[in-house]
A protein has these predicted regions:
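Generic structural detector for well-ordered beta-strands
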Residues: 116, 126, 157-161, 171-173, ...
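Residue-level detector of beta-strand face positions
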Residues: 126, 142-144, 187-189, 229, ...
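Intrinsically disordered, low-complexity Pro/Gly/Ser/Thr-rich segments with frequent PxxP/GP/PP motifs
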Residues: 140-142, 146-184, 190-193, 198
Length: 239
C-alpha cells in the first residue's frame, strides 16, 4: 500500500495504477482488502486490482468407502511426484459455485453504497453513492435500531435521490433508549426497487452497522477482586 501511495505521489504520472493480483483467496484470506480500497476510493489514479481467484479448481471424487470429497492437486499423479498440495483450492466459491465465507467479506468491501454515522443522537448518516451510472433512488434503505436484548426500538424505510459519485445526508431522527439497554445498534440495509436478471427485490446489495452510545443512566454491575480499581475511559468499540 505504501508503494501505491508513493507511485501516486509522483507529479508526472499519466497511467493508472492497477494491481494484477492484490489478494489471494486461499483459505482464511482476503482480510486486508479495506486498506487497499481506502486508497482506491481516495486516489483517482489508483484503479483497483484483481483477486486470485474466483472458483476452486477441484473435482468431486468418491473414496473407497463411497464418500465423496473435493479433490485437488495433491490427490493426483504417481506417488513421490511433487505437487502444490491444496493450492488449486483458492477461490471465493467452491467448484459448484457455493460461496466460501470470505466471499461475504469481499462483497462488504466492494459494496457501492457506503454510509457513515455523523450524529449519534438525532440519528444522521451520510451516504456515498459509488455507482457510476445508477442513482440511489433505485434502491430502498431499510433501517432499524436494535437493542442488545434483540428488541427493535425503531425502524423505517427511506428512498432518496443521489447521483453517481455524490453524497447525501439522511436524517432518521431521535430514538429513545430504554433505561435497561446497555448498547444499541443502527442497522442499514439497501435493496433494489426492481428485480433484475441477477437479483430480486429482497437481495441486499449493501449494509452497514453502527454502535450507538450506551445509555448513560445504566450502571453495569461488576464484581471486582479486592484492591482492584475500575477506571472509565469512555472508549467505545464500533465498526
Amino acid at each position: 500500500i505504501d508503494e501505491i501511495k508513493a507511485y501516486l505521489a509522483q507529479p508526472d504520472i499519466y497511467r493508472p495504477f492497477i494491481l494484477c493480483e492484490y489478494a489471494h483467496a486461499m483459505g482464511n484470506s482476503v482480510g486486508g482488502l479495506k486498506d487497499y480500497w481506502d486508497v482506491f476510493e481516495s486516489e483517482p489514479m489508483a484503479q483497483g486490482g484483481c483477486i486470485w481467484d474466483w472458483v476452486d479448481q477441484s473435482f468431486r471424487e468418491v473414496d473407497s468407502d463411497g464418500r465423496w470429497y473435493w479433490s485437488y492437486g495433491g490427490d493426483y499423479g504417481p506417488e513421490g511426484v511433487p505437487s502444490f498440495g491444496s493450492f488449486c483450492c483458492n477461490g471465493l466459491v467452491n467448484a459448484v459455485r457455493e460461496p466460501h465465507p470470505h466471499l461475504f467479506a469481499v462483497k462488504k468491501v466492494y459494496q457501492y453504497i457506503k454510509s457513515r454515522l455523523i450524529d449519534n443522537e438525532n440519528l444522521t448518516v451520510t451516504v456515498k453513492n459509488w455507482y457510476d451510472f445508477t442513482d440511489l433512488k433505485n434502491y430502498t434503505l431499510h433501517w432499524n435500531v436494535t437493542a442488545d436484548n434483540g428488541n427493535i426500538l425503531a425502524q423505517g424505510e427511506v428512498i432518496t435521490a443521489c447521483a453517481p459519485h455524490e453524497t447525501v445526508e439522511i436524517v432518521l431522527g431521535k430514538v429513545k433508549l430504554p433505561r435497561d439497554v446497555k448498547e444499541a445498534y443502527l442497522n442499514l440495509s439497501w435493496t433494489p426497487n426492481q428485480a433484475s436478471a441477477f437479483m430480486d427485490t429482497n437481495y441486499e446489495v449493501a449494509y452497514d452497522q453502527f454502535v450507538l452510545l450506551a445509555n448513560s443512566k445504566y450502571e453495569a454491575k461488576i464484581d471486582l477482586p479486592s484492591g482492584t480499581k475500575l477506571e472509565r475511559d469512555g472508549y467505545t468499540w464500533f465498526n
